[in-house]
UniProtKB/Swiss-Prot annotation:
PROSITE patterns: RIBOSOMAL_L1 (PS01199). Belongs to the universal ribosomal protein uL1 family. The keyword Cytoplasm does not apply. Pfam families: Ribosomal_L1. Transmembrane segments: none annotated. It comes from Brucella canis (strain ATCC 23365 / NCTC 10854 / RM-666). Part of the 50S ribosomal subunit. GO terms for molecular function: rRNA binding; structural constituent of ribosome; tRNA binding. It comes from the Bacteria. One of its GO terms (cellular component) is cytosolic large ribosomal subunit. HAMAP family: Ribosomal_uL1_B. One of its GO terms (biological process) is regulation of translation. This is Large ribosomal subunit protein uL1. InterPro entries: Ribosom_uL1_bac-type, Ribosomal_uL1, Ribosomal_uL1-like, Ribosomal_uL1/biogenesis, Ribosomal_uL1_3-a/b-sand, Ribosomal_uL1_CS.
Length: 233
């Protein structure tokens, strides 16, 4: 227990939890305090002025990070015939139709992102209780219900990140690794923030982006000045 407390204190050391840091300084603090023995993910949290209980205030979208996420993304594709072959050639990890439905319906989820052709949605829609809570249900709004499965697979493998506001009005996402250089992390964060801003629902009134913070997987959150991530209401 003492070792854990010592580690936590070391991570927190030098971080003013009441200060808003500019993005560049915040990235430096996060990287300096990433002490885990693995390549931690750098995560962003954005508190938005929306109430997602109302359908017209839902914030959802997808963004292709310019420098990728640094993680290996396993992609499953529901498709038949030529589209199934296209998905395989594009590098999809799992491709199938009814047989894949049975596997997923049984609770075996061995992928991180799910794509489907439009004709497969009557079948895939029945997996709502399995895929929905995991944020994996294919949706045309984020490009995961499409006839261009090759492009969707390439995007998923290349750094596409889906985002969706949670009940408390917060959006979380992994936007890179602590091993990335500072400039690449900054580019990714700004690209993500810009996408969230562009997804602002017309029903959202008042201040849209209330708070922004970044952290590493095992690290402490560092508050970021929203203006330094190009956040403008």
């Amino acid at each position: 227990m003492a070792k854990i407390s010592k580690r936590i204190n070391k991570i927190r050391e030098g971080v003013d939890r009441n200060k808003l840091y500019d993005l560049s300084a915040a990235i430096g603090l996060v990287k300096e305090r990433a002490v885990a023995k693995f390549d931690e993910t750098v995560e962003i949290a954005m508190n938005l002025g929306v109430d997602p209980r109302h359908a017209d205030q839902m914030v959802r979208g997808v963004v292709n990070l310019p420098n990728g996420t640094g993680r290996t993304v396993r992609v499953a594709v529901f498709a038949r015939g030529d589209k199934a072959e296209e998905a395989k050639k594009a590098g999809a990890d799992i491709v199938g139709a009814e047989e894949l439905f049975e596997i997923v319906n049984g609770g075996k989820i061995e992928f991180d992102r799910c794509i489907a052709t439009p004709d497969m949605m009557p079948l895939v829609g029945r997996l709502g209780k399995v895929l929905g809570p995991r944020g994996m249900m294919p949706n045309p709004k984020v490009g995961t219900v499409t006839t261009d499965v090759a492009a969707a697979v390439a995007a998923s493998k290349g750094g596409a990140v889906e985002f969706r506001v949670e009940k408390a009005g917060i959006i979380h996402a992994g936007i890179g690794k602590v091993s990335f250089d500072n400039a690449k992390l900054e580019e990714n964060i700004k690209a993500f923030a810009d996408a969230v801003i562009k997804a602002k629902p017309s029903a959202a009134k008042g201040e849209y982006v209330k708070r922004v913070s970044i952290s590493s997987t095992m690290g402490v959150g560092v508050k970021v000045d929203p203006s330094t991530v190009k956040v403008v209401d």
